[in-house]
Structure formats: structure tokens, C-alpha cells
Amino acid sequence: MQYSHHCEHLLERLNKQREAGFLCDCTVVIGEFQFKAHRNVLASFSEYFGAIYRSTSENNVFLDQSQVKADGFQKLLEFIYTGTLNLDSWNVKEIHQAADYLKVEEVVTKCKIKMEDFAFIASPSSTEISSITGNIELNQQACLLTLRDYNNREKSEVSTDSVQANPKPRALTKKSSQSKKKKKAFSSQKPGQSKAVQYPSDVLESASVELFLETSKLSSPVVEQIIQGNDSSELELTSVVENTFPTQDIVQTVTVKRKRRKSQSHCALKEHSMSNIASVKSPYELENAGEELDARFSKAKPMCNTCGKVFSEASSLRRHMRIHKGVKPYVCHLCGKAFTQCNQLKTHVRTHTGERPYKCELCDKGFAQKCQLVFHSRMHHGEEKPYKCDVCNLQFATSSNLKIHARKHSGEKPYVCDRCGQRFAQASTLTYHVRRHTGEKPYVCDTCGKAFAVSSSLITHSRKHTGEKPYICGICGKSFISSGELNKHFRSHTGERPFICELCGNSYTDIKNLKKHKTKVHSGTDKNPDCSVDDHAVSEQDSVQRSPLSETLDVKPSDMTLPLALPLGTEDHQMLLPVTDSQSPASDTLLRSTVNGYSEPQLIFLQQLY
């Protein structure tokens, strides 16, 4: 028994593995962009990759940027893994160039067909105007046929330098004695008017289109009668055309419009075509059709098919799609960390260089990111906090803070430890939790050498050396080095004892006092793993969240447990670096790894980045 969707399912699973970087055994490098993939998949679709992997076992394949553009290769890679190829006037050339270089013949064929279509739209001939008007109604098609034949007759008269005594359009085939008499009377000319005027062929071609557009205003009953074969109606239509548009007037009109079409892009010809035939563009307007198509398509804002987000530019959408696909082409040459966008890499590099380009005008503090400066101004200089909780009406300086706060109400904990299964509301909390499993302590005090797993712990510890105590009790005026100590002190005023022993019911103001109690009184009893020393930092953090003080006081940015590098969303401007007061050691000194100097490749990388 054969399952019809088995191949699609296999390709879908391979694509998900590629996006997650799972089992990818090769990396395609184009300039500063890197694309992970599977060798067997690339070799199956591309003769170029098939030839390479027959002769080498290297994991990295470097492609020439002049031959293969990163955007074109990304679209090609998506086609290989999904079978979907979206071609438009913006990307077809890059995709064709990449497919031709990598020998993906199926895509080359599709691109050639598409480019021919775009070339036809950009430069149509006047005789092919009917191909553009695919949805013209039947009566307008009949007008076009009749008038073209009429114009062909005029051309033949000009070429022979004589006027036919009884001219008649070829499309009007039926004959009657009455119509012959009327046609003869209508078309006969006086001797003084018998001289033919010879015009250039391109003017006559333009006159044909002019006739077609103008006669689209003719009454529908006349045209319907022509289609049904009514001889008198044919004559009536011909008479209307002759009387309304004499040959001399047509040529004069076309000549004038050809002279002024550059200065008057929206001429009367366009008005006629738009009002009568909505899908038709005149040859004058199609002269620069490529630019007009780009302008028309640019008015429709590009939208992400995955999440529905709308962007102002196609380039913004391409950058956004890297988030869904897991592509991180920007790599830090100092530590190897990869990022989705270039501005994220630049911000990250400031953790190595210590650069702080954004200065506060009120207190002269410097920040690595503009969003940090905005956050600082809202927290410390009275600027409005625009993000308000719908449940408790608390206001926040950033949307990310509001999002994290909302999880207290919803109970959502989306971040799960893959080692023990514990869940967390913040990604940073999960990061610090994992370090308890690994024992990693990357933040080292330059003064005493003590190491910490959390950056905020190092900042708080450094205040012991500097003597800084930025947190002040609003009741007694006593100052403290951290918000946790301030909250602990505040309980002495309120009498709150949030830490309760589950064995005997005693309560305490501090988690340390609870642990001392358990050690002395319940030393022979099995300890509750939730009250272990390993969870000290989390319990202390929970105490800050449960404290009534946190409802009235703003948490200092330096106590926000945020990781060094988080993906920057367009809505969630998360902080990449903790903000410290001017008296404390600079955060670049605290957070940087102790590096004596940069190697030459690293210096080149920094120069190219800026």
C-alpha cells in the first residue's frame, strides 16, 4: 500500500531539521551569510553540489558572491526543501543567476519563462496590445478587430497613393444592395480631396491604438448588432468612426501626445483607458512599464505568510523570515556567537569593546543601545511608561517587561529546562538555571576574582567594593546595595514574614533565616528540595516579586536579570546589557571576558563592522 503524502511528509521533516540545524552536515557560506543544509538533499537537486561532494568531504562550501547572491540562494534553498518557488520582478534575476551557477535546471527553466513574461510586459508592441487586455469584454474585442482592419485598409491606401472608390473594412463581410449604396455615398470623395497623405508607420500604429481606445466609448447596442451580423450596424459604426476621427485629426493628436508624453504622464489617453478598459495600459504608459510595475507592487506592503506581520519594505520581510527559519548569518568573530540581524551583531560587539554611543542628556550616562536609553529615561527621569497591565493597571517602561509581568497573572511558563523539566517565565531565568546544572560562572569580579552565574549578581557584588548603596528606604532613609536587601529591610516595618517552614509552620522575613532554622531544628529531617541552597537566587527573586514593595517601587535596571544577548524583535526591545549607575564600575569592565588584545583577523572584523 502506497501512502500518497509520504514524500511531502519526508520533505517537510527535512526542512524542519534544516531550520533547526538538526543533523545538518554542511554549511554554504556566501560572504558573511551562512546557510546550514544536508549534503544529500543539495546533491540531489544541484549538479554543482553533486560534483563537489563526490570529490571532497569538507563541511563548508564557499560560493562567490558575484555569481550567487545570498537572497537568491535562500529562495533556491527554500525551493529545494519545500518545492515552493515564488518569483517576482524583484528576485527572479538573482534566483536565475544562482540556479544557473549551481545547475538546478528546473529552476532555470521556470525563471526564463518568468523573465520572458516580465520582458513582454515591460515592452509590448502595439500589435500585441490585445494580448495585454486579457479580460476585455466581448463588445470591446469586436471594436478592436473592426478598427484594426479599418486601419489596415488606410495603410494600403497610403502605400498605393490612391483613394479607393468603395473602401470597406474586411471584418464587415456581409453585403446588401442598400449598404453598398450607402457605403459608396459615404466613402466617395471630391477631386480636391483625393490626394493621399503618407504618414510614418509608427504613427499609424499609434493611431490604431488611439482609435481603439476612443471607440470603446461607442454605444453597446451598435457593437452587439455588428456581432450578430447586421449590415446596417456595420455601416453605422464605420460612419461614426469616420466622422468622429478623421485621419488627419488622428495623426495630429498622436503626434502632439508623443511630443508631450514625457511631461504629461497622466494624459487623456490614460483617462480613456482607465475609465473604459480597467485592465488596459496604453503604449505610452507601458514605455517604462518595469518602473511602473515596481512602483505599483511597492504600494502593496509585504506580509509574512507565517505570522501575518506586515512590513513597509520587502527587505524588512526577508530579514524577518530569518527568525522563522532559524537563519543566523551574522557571526561575531570574537566569540563565535551568531545573530539574525546585523544590528544585533553590532550591539553584541559592544559587550567586547565597551562602546556606549547613546548618552543621556540629563545625567551623562552612556548606553550600548538606544532602547536602553529610552528605558533609563522612563525609569529615572519621569518620562511616561506607556505599557499598562490590563489586570492590575501597573505601568512599565518596555513592552517586554509588560509581557513578562503578564505571565504572573496567566501562570504561563514557556521556557523549559531540557535536563530537569523545570519551567520558567523568562528566558534569562532558564539560562541562569541551566548554569546551575553546568556549573558555569562567566562573570568574574576584577577586584577579588569571585565568579558568578548571573550578571546582576556581579553588579551587586561590585557595590561592596565601591560602597555604593542606590536603594533607599522610603520610611527610615536607610540605603542598601540591592533591591532584595531593601525589600528584606522593608519587612521589618511591615511585619511581613513570607518564608514559612513547611515542617513546623514558623515564618521568617529572610530565606537565610529559614535555612538556618531548618539546619538547627530540623537537621535530621529530609530537606525539601524546593528549599535547597541551589534555589537561593530564585527564592530571593520570588521574594522580590511577592513583596508589596515591588508594587510601589520601580525595579532598577541593574537588577533586571536579562541575558547578554537576546533576539531583538520589532516590538520587544529587550535589553542586551544591564544598566548601572555612574559610580559603579563600567558594565563593559564587569561583563567583558578578560582579553589582553585582539588578533589581526578580529581587528579586521571590527573595522569592517563599523
Swiss-Prot record:
Q: Which GO terms describe its biological process?
A: cellular response to leukemia inhibitory factor
Q: Which InterPro entries match?
A: BTB/POZ_dom, Ikaros_C2H2-ZF, SKP1/BTB/POZ_sf, Znf_C2H2_sf, Znf_C2H2_type
> What's a Pfam family in this record?
zf-C2H2
CDD domains attached to this UniProt entry: BTB_POZ_ZBTB31_myoneurin (cd18217)
> What GO CC terms are in its UniProt record?
nucleoplasm
Work out whether the entry's keyword set contains Repeat: yes
Reply yes or no: does the keyword Lipoprotein apply.
no
Q: Which PROSITE patterns match?
A: BTB, ZINC_FINGER_C2H2_1, ZINC_FINGER_C2H2_2
The free-text tissue note of the record is:
Mainly expressed in the neuromuscular system. Located in and around synaptic myonuclei in adult muscle. Expression is dysregulated after nerve injury. Also found in the cerebellum, testis, heart, brain and liver.
- Gene3D superfamilies the record matches: Classic Zinc Finger, Potassium Channel Kv1.1, Chain A
Q: List all Basic and acidic residues biased stretches.
A: 523-539
Bias category Basic residues: which stretches? 171-185
The entry's localization annotation reads: Nucleus
Zn finger region (C2H2-type): 302-324, 330-352, 358-381, 387-409, 415-437, 443-465, 471-493, 499-522
Locate the BTB domain: which residues?
24-89
Chain positions covered by the region annotation Disordered: 156-199, 519-548
- SUPFAM superfamilies the record matches: beta-beta-alpha zinc fingers, POZ domain
Question: What terms describe the molecular function in GO for this protein?
Answer: DNA binding; zinc ion binding
Keywords (alphabetical) are: DNA-binding, Metal-binding, Nucleus, Repeat, Transcription, Transcription regulation, Zinc, Zinc-finger
| Motif range (Nuclear localization signal) | 174-190, 257-262
Q: Which PANTHER family match?
A: KLUMPFUSS, ISOFORM B-RELATED, ZINC FINGER PROTEIN
Protein family membership? Belongs to the krueppel C2H2-type zinc-finger protein family.
Q: What is this protein called?
A: Myoneurin
* Species name: Mus musculus
